[in-house]
Amino acid sequence: MREEFLEEIPLDAPPEEAKELRTEVMTLNVGPQHPSTHGVLRLMVTLSGEEVLEVVPHIGYLHTGFEKTMEHRTYLQNITYTPRMDYLHSFAHDLAYALAVEKLLGAVVPPRAETIRVILNELSRLASHLVFLGTGLLDLGALTPFFYAFRERETILDLFEWVTGQRFHHNYIRIGGVKEDLPEEFVPELKKLLEVLPHRIDEYEALFAESPIFYERARGVGVIPPEVAIDLGLTGGSLRASGVNYDVRKAYPYSGYETYTFDVPLGERGDVFDRMLVRIREMRESVKIIKQALERLEPGPVRDPNPQITPPPRHLLETSMEAVIYHFKHYTEGFHPPKGEVYVPTESARGELGYYIVSDGGSMPYRVKVRAPSFVNLQSLPYACKGEQVPDMVAIIASLDPVMGDVDR
């Protein structure tokens, strides 16, 4: 605002004269090091006073070349790369990649391994939504829910550590099953968590849904109509908050999801409030799925017995030279899927996560393309922010729940 404009119109001028007060359009650089961007995201924001006229996202600060790297590693070696894209819901990438390679190979995953995958995937979804809830409300100035959300998340990470040995980047899912069976203490501890988690989720919803302050900050802010959401390619909670009933677990079931009973929560207005509410209600559905999975967790193998896919058991290495040779070739050369191409979509915490893999018959994929939901969902940010206020832009970013490792890859 220029000083000469202020001199022309006195401070005690009547409203009709004050309307003539002019402002300058300003460009504001937000990020890439800024807590509200949830990672290394840079936004070029054009403002007229406090009103957002335009937002241009600049990405690529976390680009690590995952797709090209995976084309120069064996199918088995790539398992260590996949969880590092979406580090908050890493089981989703592990599972999607494994399903795509298994489709190429025609592998058969044992029922117990499928059930274990579902349990861990839904637990990982819960942990991701807890981060979304805690940090999203923290961006709006609510500090207490952050500690509540991370309290339950720590319990989930402890469960992961028991099963996989890692709190992050688990590398537990294998082509044709999982690395090993669940430890004995896992199921009893998981049941303890499932006893208290539904009540805690009710508390989370009450904390923000019944808060008049949050209601004013979130209701009607960053509205994305259903037709716009579809045109922009939104998926996951951001799409369902606009009232579009699309969940990959229902539309294209995998890992036996068609045999589980769960609902798909939908929003009504497609605003920040609905995007928060839908994800909290999704947490209840994840609890339902895990409880059903525990009931059908029967004893059995956890790897495809096909020797072309699964290495020989460790105890055979002490008595069989053939087992030693095959074990060596399995981990150095890997297996050779037939020529072909596949695309397998899955439902991650952020939306449709898909792996497109092309095989030329070698031990390494010829082409890997990852359909990352965070990358696609971020395209809606300019539309959702236009006409809103600067503080509301922070809430809109949080409600889209982007993970920059998923965006840049």
UniProtKB/Swiss-Prot annotation:
- Subunit annotation: NDH-1 is composed of 15 different subunits, Nqo1 to Nqo15. The complex has a L-shaped structure, with the hydrophobic arm (subunits Nqo7, Nqo8 and Nqo10 to Nqo14) embedded in the membrane and the hydrophilic peripheral arm (subunits Nqo1 to Nqo6, Nqo9 and Nqo15) protruding into the bacterial cytoplasm. The hydrophilic domain contains all the redox centers. This subunit interacts extensively with Nqo6.
Question: How is it placed in the membrane, per its record?
Answer: Peripheral membrane protein
Q: Where is the signal peptide?
A: none
Task: Identify the InterPro entries for this entry.
Answer: NADH_Q_OxRdtase_suD (IPR001135), NADH_UbQ_OxRdtase_49kDa_CS (IPR014029), NDH1_su_D/H (IPR022885), NiFe-Hase_large (IPR029014)
- The domain of life is Bacteria
What are the protein's UniProt keywords? Cell membrane, Membrane, NAD, Quinone, Translocase, Transport
Catalysed reaction equations from the record: a quinone + NADH + 5 H(+)(in) = a quinol + NAD(+) + 4 H(+)(out)
Its Gene Ontology molecular function terms? Answer: NAD binding; NADH:ubiquinone reductase (non-electrogenic) activity; quinone binding
Family named by the database record: Belongs to the complex I 49 kDa subunit family.
Q: Name one GO cellular component term.
A: plasma membrane
Q: What is its EC number?
A: 7.1.1.-
Q: Which organism is it from?
A: Thermus thermophilus (strain ATCC 27634 / DSM 579 / HB8)
Name used for this protein in its record:
NADH-quinone oxidoreductase subunit 4
The answer to whether keyword Cell membrane applies is yes
The main location is membrane
Q: What does this protein do?
A: NDH-1 shuttles electrons from NADH, via FMN and iron-sulfur (Fe-S) centers, to quinones in the respiratory chain. The immediate electron acceptor for the enzyme in this species is menaquinone. Couples the redox reaction to proton translocation (for every two electrons transferred, four hydrogen ions are translocated across the cytoplasmic membrane), and thus conserves the redox energy in a proton gradient required for the synthesis of ATP. The Nqo4 subunit may contain the quinone-binding site.
Per UniProt, subcellular location reads as: Cell membrane
